[in-house]
């Protein structure tokens, strides 16, 4: 059966970090609740933006190592398209213990929670605010934590956006290399090499320098080292792609996997995608993008997140972009996840796609002509009767 390929123009945006800017200048203050919540495995700093709306889930974020919720997510959540989404949802930002701004050093002998224990702290956070369910957004270590939380508590997670997720335990060779690097390499360099690819370190010098300065000047080095050790000691998530007639451990909720094409996490994200239910999973690869797509490509990620949420049935069609409405009206279709059906681009069941910029919005553009290529993740159509994950490149 033939499949239609659709090219969609995408407008790029200027980097959010310009020369001379600092992380502080990028972060806008919110009128929010901030609390240190006691859980089974210690205290965790939580920031709740907005008021939870009835039975609707909240968007819960978890950051990567070397970051906190502000440096990891504020540039994305301050972007205008994302603010359109957050009008419909409260947002709960979780900072890993000791990673928030101004965090005090842990006492000598403090046992930092394991990655599994960090995930086990989240039910207490939801209980504190009276929250029943979440749409999770995690990056790196945070993506691992939210995935573990969803595996343990599937009834609490309605969807996951996982940026740079690595489902595997660190191999013993990687572990040894990280230990040796710890003896010879400064902590900021270790974190920067985790966050950014080699190409990006040369092409986006100012961005890398900005985050390096944040790590040096704003992060508590002892606390950060404990968080890094916890991440490097993570267990394999032991997830498997479900097969008919077998019982496997995998995510039960829809998942959007996101990675930049020059990110150091590309291979890990592709590996994770191969272990998830292809009928519920979309892999979004961002072209000309490094390790932090939420920083360098907020427009694309916000649009993908909008369609992801609409596919879960939450945002009304009035919130769809002009392009999305026109495609819905015309009944244009895209190859479905099982490779055998076509599906209209409605707000129900829509997978992540990016769009041309609307003339009514004010944005800064640096280049034009990018396109969206929608293809099945593995194998050609007709060669495999089984379902295929959808891979979206933009």
UniProtKB/Swiss-Prot annotation:
The organism's place on the tree of life at top rank: Eukaryota
Major place of residence: cytoplasm
Region (Disordered): 325-394
Segments annotated as Sequence repeats: 339-348, 349-358, 359-368
Annotated Pfam families: Ndr (PF03096)
Official protein name in the record: Protein NDRG1
Compositionally biased spans, kind Basic and acidic residues: 345-371
Lineage, uppermost ranks: Eukaryota, Metazoa, Chordata, Craniata, Vertebrata
Cellular localization per UniProt: Cytoplasm, Cytosol; Cytoplasm, Cytoskeleton, Microtubule organizing center, Centrosome; Nucleus; Cell membrane
InterPro entries registered for this protein in UniProt: AB_hydrolase_fold, NDRG
Phosphothreonine PTM positions: 328, 335, 340, 346, 356, 366, 375
Modified residues (Phosphoserine): 2, 319, 326, 330, 332-333, 336, 342, 352, 362, 364
Gene: Ndrg1
Keywords, sorted A to Z: Acetylation, Cell membrane, Cytoplasm, Cytoskeleton, Membrane, Microtubule, Nucleus, Phosphoprotein, Repeat
UniProt family annotation: Belongs to the NDRG family.
Positions where N-acetylserine occurs in the chain: 2
Region span, 3 X 10 AA tandem repeats of G-[PST]-R-S-R-S-H-T-S-E: 339-368
Protein's UniProt keywords contain Phosphoprotein: yes
Function per UniProt: Stress-responsive protein involved in hormone responses, cell growth, and differentiation. Acts as a tumor suppressor in many cell types. Necessary but not sufficient for p53/TP53-mediated caspase activation and apoptosis. Has a role in cell trafficking notably of the Schwann cell and is necessary for the maintenance and development of the peripheral nerve myelin sheath. Required for vesicular recycling of CDH1 and TF. May also function in lipid trafficking. Protects cells from spindle disruption damage. Functions in p53/TP53-dependent mitotic spindle checkpoint.
Subunit record text: Interacts with RAB4A (membrane-bound form); the interaction involves NDRG1 in vesicular recycling ofCDH1. Interacts with APOA1, APOA2, PRA1 and RTN1.
